[in-house]
Amino acid sequence: MWNYLSLLPVILFLWAIAGIWIVFAIAVVNGSVDLNEGFPFISICGSYAPQSCIFGQVLNIGAALTVWICIVRHHQLRDWGVKTWQNQLILWSGILCALGTSIVGNFQDKNQKPTHLAGAFLAFILGNLYFWLQFFLSWWVKGLPQPGPHWIKSLRLSLCSLSTILIVAMIVLHALHMRSASAICEWVVAMLLFMLFGFFAVDFSILRGCTLHLHPRLDSSLPQAPSGSPNIQMAQVL
């Protein structure tokens, strides 16, 4: 049964893809990029006003959704008995991917190129690593639940492999000054990563919801709650 948590990956997928293609369309229409000179990188499309404002907002909201998804996934893996160090490694690679996405949106290529490239490294490289770690985890941990149809695992492997190949191709082609080919690889990698995040909808479909637990500090100087008072240690996250 689908729930609001399973909608998060779908919302991220639709939001990110629609957002960056809208930015591309605006850049082409207002002449910020010229397709006759070659296919542009995503960052070039988002470097000039007014689409730079939209670009930053799209990536900031996308980064926030990514962090939310990574945290939900972290707790899901924890409840499945995944070791803490493995789960923490996966979580932080996802959070750093989200941080890189936000950096890319806020530090445009034409204004702060070194910072922008650092953000792109986090977004693409660690984003790809995040999904490889998720995939390898399904092999490391025996008996780990595999929600969804059996072909999902094979599809994720294919998408991760293609993403890795295209990242390498993107870097090599850029070094060879084949910018249009490199830019096309970048766009495809971005679409693949959005798709991989979107597939978390399958994993989250078995969840009913999530709760936030508040643990009060143990201090004898604090007044004790009166008998019969409402339990304030758990609040439902809406």
UniProtKB/Swiss-Prot annotation:
Tell me one GO biological process term. Answer: autophagy
Per the record, membrane topology reads: Multi-pass membrane protein
Extracellular face residues: 30-51, 108-116, 178-186
- Keyword terms: Autophagy, Cell membrane, Cytoplasmic vesicle, Endosome, Glycoprotein, Membrane, Transmembrane, Transmembrane helix
In the record, the note on similarity to other proteins reads: Belongs to the DRAM/TMEM150 family.
Question: What function does the entry list?
Answer: Modulator of macroautophagy that causes accumulation of autophagosomes under basal conditions and enhances autophagic flux. Represses cell death and promotes long-term clonogenic survival of cells grown in the absence of glucose in a macroautophagy-independent manner. May have some role in extracellular matrix engulfment or growth factor receptor recycling, both of which can modulate cell survival.
Its protein name is: Modulator of macroautophagy TMEM150B
* Source organism of this protein record: Mus musculus (Mouse)
